[in-house]
Amino acid sequence: TICTGADRPCAACCPCCPGTSCQGPESNGVVYCRNF
């Protein structure tokens, strides 16, 4: 599962996917929260 946090801080993005860690920002400026 990948949650994007383009319009908000990564800290606000990650809780929607338990077990994620913040990755990015990518070249498109989006911070992704990836579920391992």
Swiss-Prot record:
Keywords of this entry: Calcium-activated potassium channel impairing toxin, Disulfide bond, Ion channel impairing toxin, Knottin, Neurotoxin, Potassium channel impairing toxin, Secreted, Toxin
Tissues and organs where the protein is expressed, per its UniProt entry: Expressed by the venom gland.
GO cellular component, one term: extracellular region
S-S bonds: C3-C17, C10-C22, C13-C14, C16-C33
Site positions per UniProt: Critical for the neurotoxic activity: R8, P9, C13, C14, Y32
Localization of this protein: Secreted
Site for Important for the neurotoxic activity, residues: I2, V30
Single GO MF descriptor: potassium channel regulator activity
Pfam families xref list: Toxin_16 (PF07945)
Broad class of where this protein is predominantly found: secreted
UniProt xrefs under SUPFAM superfamilies: omega toxin-like
Residue ranges the record marks as coiled coil: none
InterPro entries membership: Toxin_16 (IPR012499)
Domain statement: The presence of a 'disulfide through disulfide knot' structurally defines this protein as a knottin.
Protein family (similarity comment): Belongs to the neurotoxin 11 (kappa toxin) family.
Role of this protein: This excitatory toxin inhibits insect calcium-activated potassium (KCa) channels (Slo-type).
Protein name (Swiss-Prot/TrEMBL): Lambda-hexatoxin-Hv1a
Provenance organism: Hadronyche versuta
